[in-house]
């Protein structure tokens, strides 16, 4: 008779060899379905190429792409994934075959914390996605609607500038101030008020944290029990429950409000109005969908936007020549006024400010690997056979540093954008911070309005020094790790008022 320990060991050994067999059979069947596959690095049983991703997958995938080409096939566990690492490959996927690659793969943890993937970013391609994106484009993120929230952006930017002005000569954490700015702007626009409470900050941080944790079950379904054993799944369910309770409370508060003027309407008011209109038209707009869009406005409007602003001001501070040239342009725009407004920026040309925004987003794409897509049908990409169900990763970070496109690709040179029409709005596949095609970010105008106003005023109002006698050129620009790639270390500076 075997002891219980021996039985356990035999069970694990049997399971291991069974999974190797299943994995090899699956790889074999995939190869038979698609005869002309993209080049592929050798993978290990069960985990495939997961071990080769490291702490910075976008960088590891660049190393692999140098060997296997701009369109390669990897296996993340049992999931086949093609990785596009050139503008040409990205264009075939997001333009030529955009519809075939317009759905999202189901991600377990993301689904749990997003009302069963009801937010637009995670939603599979279909009627729900079309309806929700239409609400965004027509009701929440239209040019008229974005402009209607101008006073909120200017109010909160001015409050940040006041705090910095009162701290001149002292060390400040500019990273934290920028994060607070975007949080306050989005909370006022989305929910009608700011949330200073620690529980709110901790809840939103926990949601982002669980989204950034690697989920074994996404790639090796037979090992999904590891997500439960590690506590990840439990954390996700707990965060989802707390998030639902918070958003439900916000909705109920708004349902009891009296009619508001258009200037005073926030996103929740607009969504409730949309819900009533669609109910009258016989196209129900469900409660979970409403709360999912409320959640998405916060996540999409804060994390990536603050990351972008943080990198922009970091690069300008690190390069005094760029700072001086931008200040000269902004001085011309402001004409001696205390602050720069959105109207000032609309009524004047500011090519150098625009060039800095583009160059910073080229070097520091907030989300270096665009959210994964999935093929709904068999298709040929760059001459290779891609089977339905294959996932797609676009390495936007590698494309933005491609030396065949960008001279001195790893250096910060805003001047490169003064003589080119390349933009970040999804029409130029050399620069994809917001993605492109059907799954491109619908909130570009919203994000860039905050970006531009904040950067313009920070540079117009202040000069900056580094603490401890460091030269500006010594500013540490190390990346963090995660879905969103922020600065690894807070941006600590000493501001000085220019006037």
From Swiss-Prot:
Named in its record, the pathway it takes part in is: Secondary metabolite biosynthesis; terpenoid biosynthesis
Task: Provide the residue positions that the database annotates as binding heme.
Answer: 441
Q: Which cofactor does it need?
A: heme
Give compartment(s): Membrane
Its EC number(s): 1.14.14.-
Enzyme class, first EC level, given as a word: oxidoreductase
One of this protein's Pfam families, by short name?
p450
A GO molecular-function descriptor: parthenolide 3beta-hydroxylase activity
Q: Its membrane topology, per UniProt?
A: Single-pass type II membrane protein
Q: Which UniProt keywords apply?
A: Heme, Iron, Membrane, Metal-binding, Monooxygenase, Oxidoreductase, Signal-anchor, Transmembrane, Transmembrane helix
Reaction(s) the record says it catalyses: (+)-costunolide + reduced [NADPH--hemoprotein reductase] + O2 = 3beta-hydroxycostunolide + oxidized [NADPH--hemoprotein reductase] + H2O + H(+); parthenolide + reduced [NADPH--hemoprotein reductase] + O2 = 3beta-hydroxyparthenolide + oxidized [NADPH--hemoprotein reductase] + H2O + H(+)
What biological process terms from GO does the record include?
A: sesquiterpene biosynthetic process; terpenoid biosynthetic process
Where do the TM regions start and end?
Answer: 2-22
Matching InterPro entries: Cyt_P450, Cyt_P450_CS, Cyt_P450_E_grp-I, Cyt_P450_sf
Q: Which terms in the GO cellular component ontology are assigned?
A: membrane
Similarity remark: Belongs to the cytochrome P450 family.
According to its UniProt entry, what is the function of this protein? Involved in the biosynthesis of germacrene-derived sesquiterpene lactones. Component of the parthenolide biosynthetic pathway; parthenolide and conjugates are promising anti-cancer drugs highly active against colon cancer cells. Catalyzes the conversion of costunolide and parthenolide to 3-beta-hydroxycostunolide and 3-beta-hydroxyparthenolide, respectively.
Protein name as annotated? 3-beta-hydroxylase
Native species of this protein? Tanacetum parthenium
Coding gene?
CYP71CB1
